[in-house]
A protein has these predicted regions:
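Metal/cofactor-centered catalytic core regions of large enzymes
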Residues: 1-123
Length: 123
């Protein structure tokens, strides 16, 4: 994995050198209509769900939390978690962006469908 940063690049590279931290652990789009949080709070658990004008997207490097599993998490084996794509790492660092974006799905039949635009899901 290659990584660059305008500031603290050394810290970023040290972080992703940790086992599993060079992989995506979480990705999210927040619809601006579903969050009452409209400004950064300097608390990641709030900031990763900020709505704002364009909603937000956030990506976490490192650990995938198993409590997001749709089934009975107590029965989720390590092998099954790995097969499903859960990542294991001592790192889970969220990177949040509130810039305007359009997200387009590329479908099996070769067509494309816009699913998120102007901070809102459009399905």
């Amino acid at each position: 994995m290659k990584a660059k940063a305008k500031t603290n690049e050394k810290l970023l590279k040290e972080m992703i050198a940790t086992p599993g931290a060079d992989k995506i652990g979480e990705y999210s789009l927040t619809d601006s209509r579903h969050s009452r949080i409209t400004k950064f709070m300097a608390e990641t658990l709030f900031d990763e769900n900020m709505g704002g004008r364009f909603g937000n997207s956030h990506i976490a490097l490192g650990m995938s939390y198993r409590d997001t599993y749709a089934g009975d998490v107590s029965k989720l084996t390590d092998a099954e978690a790995k097969r499903l794509g859960f990542n294991d790492s001592s790192v889970h660092t969220d990177v949040v962006s509130t810039t305007d974006r359009t997200v387009t799905a590329h479908l099996k039949d070769g067509t494309e469908k816009v699913i998120y635009k102007d901070g809102k899901f459009v399905l």
